[in-house]
From Swiss-Prot:
Transmembrane domains' residue ranges: none
Swiss-Prot/TrEMBL cofactor(s): pyruvate
Active site per the UniProt annotation: 198 (proton donor)
Lineage, top ranks: Bacteria, Bacillati, Bacillota, Bacilli, Lactobacillales
Site (Cleavage (non-hydrolytic)) location in chain: 82-83
InterPro entries the record matches: His_de-COase_proenz, Pyr-dep_his-deCO2ase_N, Pyr-dep_his/arg-deCO2ase, Pyr-dep_his/arg-deCO2ase_sand
Name listed for the protein in its UniProt record: Histidine decarboxylase proenzyme
C-alpha cells in the first residue's frame, strides 16, 4: 500500500475502482463496482461534418465524431460533474500507468500561487496520450467504457459552423473550433482535491498558425484561473498540465470541440496478474506499472509512439 493510501485509509477513504466487467470500464457510481474510488483521464478532441438543413442533427453527429476520435468514448450516456478529482481519485498516465514522458517533461512557464509558490505549467499531451493507450481508439478498442454505460464526466464543448460563402459569416460562426483541458495536482492530496479546468471556443480567422499562437495564450489564461481558484479554496497545486485540440472547417461544415474527463472503474482483465478477489492489490499493480510496462504485459502496441496522435 502506498504512503498516500495508508494516510487516506486512516480517514476512511479507499481509492479502489474495479469494474466486474471484462474488457470494459464502467462509470463511477454504477451499481456493482468494487470500491469507492474512481480513475480519471484527459480527453480533448474535435470533429466535423458537412452541414445539413438540421442544426440539431448536425450538432449530434459532430459531437459524436469528437467522442469517437482518439481516446474512444463512443456510445456512452455522459453525465456532467463539476471539475475535481479528489481523495478518491487517480489519473491515468500520472497516478497509475505513469507515462515516462511525464517525468521527462520540462515546465513551459510558471504561475505564482496565493501562497507565493510557483506553479509549473506543462503540456498535457503525455496524459492525453495515456488515455488513448488505455481506452484505445475506434479502430483499435481496448478498455473503453461499456456501450450504453453511464459515465460521469467533467466536460465542456463548443459547436460552430462555417458558411459555404465566407462573406456570409455571422456572429457565432467561424473557421475552426478548439477545446482545452487542464489538470492541476494538489500539493496535499489528503487535504485538497486536484482540479480540472476546461475551456472551448470558436476561431474566427482562416489562419491556422494564428490559432496555434492564440492557444498558447489561452494556456497562460488558464494557468491564471487555476491559481485564482486555488486561492479561493486556499489550495496549492504542485503542477498543472494543459492540453488542446482543434479543427479547422471547410466551407459548409460544422465543427464540435469537446473537453472531457471521464470518471471510471477498471475492468479486472486490464490489470496484469489482477484478481477480482484482491481489488486493493489490483490498484497497486496499476500504480506500480509504467505505461510502457503495461503495454508490454498486455501485448499491445503503442498507439501514441512517434507522435502519432493529433488532437
Amino acid at each position: 500500500m502506498s504512503e498516500l493510501d495508508a494516510k487516506l485509509n486512516k480517514l476512511g477513504v479507499d481509492r479502489i475502482a474495479i469494474s466486474p466487467y471484462k474488457q470494459w470500464t464502467r462509470g463511477y457510481m454504477e451499481p456493482g463496482n468494487i470500491g469507492n474510488g474512481y480513475v480519471t483521464g484527459l480527453k480533448v478532441d474535435a470533429g466535423v461534418r458537412d452541414k445539413s438543413d438540421d442544426d440539431v442533427l448536425d450538432g449530434i453527429v459532430s459531437y459524436d465524431r469528437a467522442e469517437t476520435k482518439n481516446a474512444y468514448i463512443g456510445q456512452i450516456n455522459m453525465t456532467t460533474a463539476s471539475s475535481f478529482t479528489g481523495v478518491q481519485g487517480r489519473v491515468i498516465g500520472y497516478d497509475i500507468l505513469r507515462s515516462p514522458e511525464v517525468d521527462k517533461a520540462k515546465p513551459l512557464f510558471t504561475e505564482t500561487q496565493w501562497d507565493g509558490s510557483e506553479l509549473p505549467i506543462y503540456d498535457a499531451k503525455p496524459l492525453q496520450d495515456a488515455l488513448v493507450e488505455y481506452f484505445g481508439t475506434e479502430q483499435d478498442r481496448r478498455h473503453y467504457p461499456a456501450p450504453g454505460s453511464f459515465i460521469v464526466c467533467a466536460n465542456k464543448g463548443v459547436t460552430a459552423e462555417r458558411p459555404k460563402n465566407d462573406a456570409d459569416m455571422k456572429p457565432g460562426q467561424g473557421y475552426g473550433v478548439w477545446s482545452a483541458i487542464a489538470i492541476s495536482f494538489a500539493k496535499d492530496p489528503t487535504k485538497d482535491s486536484s482540479m480540472f479546468v476546461e475551456d472551448a471556443g470558436v476561431w474566427e480567422t482562416p489562419n491556422e498558425d494564428e490559432l496555434l499562437e492564440y492557444l498558447e495564450g489561452r494556456r497562460k489564461a488558464m494557468a491564471k484561473s487555476i491559481a485564482e481558484c486555488g486561492q479561493d479554496a486556499h489550495a496549492s497545486f504542485e503542477s498543472s498540465w494543459i492540453g488542446f485540440a482543434y479543427t479547422m472547417m471547410e466551407p459548409g461544415q460544422i465543427g464540435n470541440a469537446i473537453t472531457v474527463a471521464p470518471y471510471v472503474s477498471l475492468p479486472i482483465d486490464s490489470i496484469p496478474g489482477g484478481s477480482i478477489l484482491t481489488p486493493d492489490k489490483d490498484m497497486e499493480i496499476m500504480e506500480n506499472l509504467t505505461m510502457p510496462e503495461w503495454l508490454e504485459k498486455m501485448g499491445y502496441k503503442s498507439l501514441s509512439a512517434n507522435n502519432a496522435l493529433k488532437y
